[in-house]
Every structure is written in structure tokens, then in C-alpha cells.
């Protein structure tokens, strides 16, 4: 049982989020003439806790259950089984109270009204949350200054770049001054400079005392931002620790990084059959390909690399210390 404590003049639970054995099953109808229903478990058994003031990461491959978990915690989906509390409120019984106290920031360009200005967008969402008119306009100004868009506040959102729209998403998610913010891949599709600015804003929010649950596909981002990270695979949490703690899963390995040209999918598949290869990832671009091979052998495997890639052009081979991404790959592929 989570005890209550005093904070900022009111009683609250010690944990901002408590998820206990959450499960979500969807009914999927298949067939054209003979239609049959199939039960699909999107989230099978998810349990974790998030402290107040923590930036907690939830990472996993596509279809692992990240978004479904977020939707249950933000009251957009009802769990099939299990329980969860958000800011001390039950996600099934206290829907309105939770929605008043949380913010949701999505990646991408959806969720904004592009034919009106940033100010008009924020006024609209402030009114939906019931923000008092006496503080609304001042808060909008503060938020637009925080995201660096005050000088473009009266321009139509359709004239904004993708990065500017993402910053406006952040302001929208903060308009009700939420205690807890859910960020679903907030830097997806952004160029490196804008993504870096977005990560800086996220850090500043934590410094201001906000609690954040972040989903991301970028392991370096989770490593940089998160106090703890949960890795979800096939609807279940397979690991939960600090970034440095997760790296211990691959402390006995090295990463052989091969930069080359002409590397094929068939050659990548060959590496997966090598006995001492724990995981393989490949970025097969048009002009340059990067192959990352996780193995306990390190430099001892170079001769095998050269043999398998004898028909490809190899520019460079490096032996690197494992990163959070390497730990992630090992956990989600094994």
C-alpha cells in the first residue's frame, strides 16, 4: 500500500503513477464472408511505479504495447484487467480528475488547428481545461516565451515549420499547468538541432518539478534524459532500471561496428547464425551502411566479419563499448 505524504500544502500519494498487472485485450474481426473474432493481447502484464519529479522512460519496438499502456494511464482506454493510479486517482473511477491534472504531448503534427494562430490554439485548449481568464493570457505568453515562439504568436500555425509545431505541442500540453506530463515520442521526425532544443526543454520541465513519462525510439535520448527506463516487449516489461543499470546486461560484450557499402540483407542474416553473435542491427542506407554486431568476442570476430562481407566494400571496423541501445537490442531480440 502506498502511503500518503504532505507536499505543497496537500496530501498525495508517494508515487505519481502506480501500474499493477495492467492488461489490454482487443477483439479483432477477420474475414470477408465468414467473419471470425480473435482476441489480441496488446498489453499482457505491465507493472511499474513512477516517483514524483521523475523522468521515466518507456521504450520498446513497434507493437510492443507502449502506446496502449499510455492510453490506459491517460484514461483513453479502459484496462481489461489490472489496476492503475495516476496522481493518486484510479484510472477507471476518477477519469475527470486525472484529465484535469495531466498533460499529453504527442510527436508529429496532429492535434493543432493550423488555420488559426498559436495564441488562438492555446486559448481554445485553455478554455477546454477551464483555465481562468484572469490567468489564461499571461500563462499563454509565458509558455510561448518558454518555447521560443512569442515573436510568431499571431501567425497562422500552417506557416510554422515541423519543429515549431512540435514546440507548440509542448505549450499545448502545459496549458493546464499539469503535475504529470505524458510525452509520446516528442522528437520523432525532427532534425537534430530542433530535437536537441526539445530535449533541453524537457530537462527544464523536470527542473521545475514536473513528472514526465516519456516514450521514445531513440535510446541515446532515453540515456540522456531518463532517471529510469522500462523496456517493454510483446506487452510485458522485460527490464526496468537506470540507464547505467540496464547497460550491465551487456557489460560482458563489445560492439563491432562495420561501416561499408554493398552489405545485403542476406549477409546480415548470416551474422545472426554465428554462434557468438548476440544481436545484429543494420542501417542499410543507399550510400553507406552501418552494421552493429554485439558479441563477447570483440576483435576476435573480425576475421569472420571479413569473410561474410568479402563481396562488400568495407570502409571501417571499430570495436566499441556497449551503449543503452545495445542493451535494448539484446533484451528485445533474445
Predicted regions and their residues:
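Catalytic Walker B motif of ABC-type/P-loop ATPase nucleotide-binding domains
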Residues: 181-185
